[in-house]
Amino acid sequence: MKFLLTGGSGHLGANLVRRLLDDGKDVRVLLREGSNNAGLDGLDVERVFGDLRNPEALKAALRGVDRVYHCAAKLSTVDGGEQELFECNVIGTRNLLRAARDAGAGRVVVTGSFSAVGHRHDAPSDETVPFNPFDKAMPYEKSKAGVEHECLKAVVEGQDVVVATSCAILGPNDFKPSRMGRTLADFANGKMRAYIPGGFEFVAARDIVSGHLLAMEKGRTGQKYIISSRFTTVDELMEIFERVTGRRRPRLRLPPPVMAVIAEVTQAVQSTFFPSRPQRLTPGAVRILRMHRRADTTKAKTELGYQPTSIEDAVKEQYEFFIGQGWIDGKSPPLARKAPATEETKKRALA
């Protein structure tokens, strides 16, 4: 049985492809030319290149494929870029689902986002809470809601599609690295000057991988399943970082309203003068942390047999991975240092 995986070089994809290979699966990965694909270096996978926005490229990628994991997505917490997000995430998913159907592929598991689940103020959100596009939301959140709409349309047309909804991922094989990965590296290297209170749902890399495998094996067609390890406040996360790295958290704990203003100004300046530079703490990210959105994972546990593991273990694994890549100075950390990556790998991954 051949599996196609999109987004194989991302944080989720790099962990999922390794699990599939460990399980003896035949894996083909769809990659974009010119992207940072270091996460697949040295792996025994078939590589095909193409863009989700190009239906012809997808026809070739799906040829002979039995099952599909669609993990690729453009991520952004910036208030802008609506058209590109729509084309990459919504149109890209539509194209992939059609190509999979035309190729006769079986089940497609699509990675969803907890950002596209509605917010309850008085209780954790489950899969039944609808996303309200008229609420204040980032273009990325709206695009991921659009992705789920495309999945439902495909199901109505007879296609076997299941959505595995991801939260913020922590864990190893973070080659790019992710926003949370950069935060951990900054903390470990003593470069984090301040933080803000808040909280969000986090998922260990091994857990979100397990959730995708379970969705493929046991999920019901047309259903989505929220996969999270646990809700964690920023203060709790700082405590975990302290235990793992041996460093103290920053003394400066900024009030969220102050940070929201700073983020607005920073986004305006950076978008104008440094548009290619990644924006870390955006107004959208601050808003999400302030919401304290909690997830109800009962459905995944009941229907799939999903069992979450430890967030602290995930942070340890991510930290050890970064040491192995040479991205942490290692002066104070208590964990064993692995062989450093080459200078070429470091530059490519941090680009």
Segments from the language model and where they lie:
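Conserved beta-loop-beta element that borders a ligand/cofactor-binding pocket
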Residues: 112, 149-172
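Conserved C-terminal active-site "lid" loop/helix of NAD(P)H-dependent oxidoreductases
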Residues: 205, 239, 266-271, 277-307
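Mid/C-terminal beta-alpha module of Rossmann-like enzyme folds, strongest
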Residues: 211-279, 297, 313-351
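N-terminal Rossmann NAD(P)H-binding glycine-rich loop of SDR-like oxidoreductase domains
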Residues: 3-23
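A conserved pocket-lining segment of Rossmann-fold NAD(P)-dependent short-chain dehydrogenase/reductase
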Residues: 131-135, 182-203, 207, 219
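NAD(P)H-binding glycine-rich loop region in Rossmannoid oxidoreductase-like domains
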Residues: 34-41, 45-91, 99
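Substrate-positioning beta->alpha
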Residues: 95, 146, 179, 196-216, ...
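Conserved Rossmann-fold NAD(P)-dependent oxidoreductase catalytic core, especially the SDR/UDP-sugar
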Residues: 83, 88-140
